[in-house]
């Protein structure tokens, strides 16, 4: 092997250990695509105020800011894989429903029914941590990829 080839192989081996290997899901669906998908979902939610009556920041800014502060505290823990790539933003849906959900890319939606039901801030932090984990672990995207694979297999079988 010539000197240039040896140098290139050595440089490749040295630099290969310098960066973290991408997660397998990142090779199929990038984190920026999560953000785009989450933004598209948010646009759909905004377009359907009868089903998803979001509280406005103009009228309920204090409540939204309070929850966003809790979110920011959890995101700053340093334990998330995508904290620098996802925009963890809290939204409140004005409906008497005991639920919350996270969109790909970090947007989260909490129903007023759940917020009013929970008695302690720690309970809400627990739910919020759960939703943040869904986004950070990319559960929605993994499910979409899995479902598309199943659909592909079904279409190939038929």
Short names for language-model regions:
Residues 3-10, 16-158:
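A Zn2+-metalloprotease active-site environment signal
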């Amino acid at each position: 092997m010539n000197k240039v080839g040896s140098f290139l192989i050595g440089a490749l081996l040295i630099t290969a250990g310098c960066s973290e290997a991408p997660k397998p899901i990142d090779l199929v669906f990038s984190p920026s695509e999560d953000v785009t998908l989450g933004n598209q979902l948010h646009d759909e939610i905004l377009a359907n105020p009868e089903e998803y009556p979001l509280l406005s920041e103009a009228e309920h800014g204090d409540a939204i800011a309070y929850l966003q502060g809790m979110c920011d505290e959890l995101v700053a823990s340093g334990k998330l894989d995508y904290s620098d790539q996802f925009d963890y933003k809290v939204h409140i849906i004005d409906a008497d429903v005991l639920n919350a959900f996270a969109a790909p890319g970090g947007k989260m939606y909490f129903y007023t029914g759940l917020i009013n039901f929970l008695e302690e801030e720690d309970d809400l932090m627990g739910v919020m941590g759960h939703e943040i984990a869904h986004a950070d672990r990319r559960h929605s995207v993994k499910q979409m990829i899995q479902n598309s694979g199943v659909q592909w297999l079904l279409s190939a079988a038929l």
